Design a protein with these regions (language model features):
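Conserved Class I SAM-dependent methyltransferase catalytic core
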Residues: 127-181
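DnaQ-like (DEDDh/DEDDy) 3′-5′ exonuclease domain used for proofreading
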Residues: 1-100, 108-127, 136
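A short acidic (Asp/Glu
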Residues: 87-88, 162-166, 190-191
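Hydrophobic alpha-helical scaffolding
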Residues: 75, 153-157, 191
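Generic beta-strand/beta-sheet core signal
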Residues: 99-104, 152-156
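Short, glycine/acidic-enriched loop or turn micro-motifs at the edges of active sites
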Residues: 83, 105, 159
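Class I S-adenosyl-L-methionine
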Residues: 177-192
Length: 192
């Protein structure tokens, strides 16, 4: 039975309310999609961005100085990453060749400046808050990258799988180059 025949059969079914019939037809119309599903979680910084234009202020004590006259113009930005990325879209869209980010790993560590515990009782899907956090930043990062631009993302095993799927969705899996694995710390003697 093809989709059209199934559609006609649903229309002819007895004992269904119009609402039930509409629901079944709606399910039939939905296209299958592979990908991540998560609940969008708003952040306080998003409210500020709606009301205020983010402004970057130069701190000469943190200037990156080069002895070369033809040196590229490098910028180190310190501050809320979503605000900084949003500010850069006004001046650097499509102009950045390399982005390196070291986002929270969602490990629950309380010693970080940023929230590193994105799973809570309100999180219907275990990784929703973290994925929502990363999605917003990576979509802006994509806007900033030049055609030859690359992004390096430091992450641990806790969110690596989710990050890979999210990056495939945003940047296309065809643009993925490689995972670079490095040993964070030496294991104690006798570790197997």
């Amino acid at each position: 039975m093809n989709k059209k025949e199934l559609y006609n059969k649903i229309l002819q079914l007895d004992g269904l309310t119009n609402e039930e019939r509409s629901e079944l037809l709606g399910l039939l119309r939905k296209q299958k999609k592979y990908g991540l599903v998560w609940e969008d979680k708003p952040e306080d910084v998003e409210e500020r961005l709606r009301d205020e234009l983010p402004v970057l202020i130069e701190d000469a004590t943190k200037a990156i100085i080069s002895d070369y006259t033809d040196a590229p113009n490098h910028v180190l930005i310190e501050g809320d990453n979503l605000e900084a990325l949003a500010a850069l879209t006004y001046t650097h869209e499509g102009k950045i060749d390399v982005i390196y980010i070291d986002p929270p790993y969602n490990t629950g560590n309380k010693d970080f400046v940023y929230n590193d515990s994105f799973v809570d009782s309100e999180d219907t899907y275990r990784h929703s808050k973290w994925l929502s956090f990363m999605n917003k930043r990576l979509r802006i990062a994509k806007q900033l990258l030049s055609d030859k631009g690359v992004i390096f993302i430091s992450i641990d095993d806790n969110e690596q799988a989710q990050l890979k799927l999210l990056c495939d969705e945003i940047f296309s899996q065809n643009n993925f180059v490689s995972d670079v694995i490095w040993q964070h710390s030496i294991q104690p003697k006798g570790y197997v």
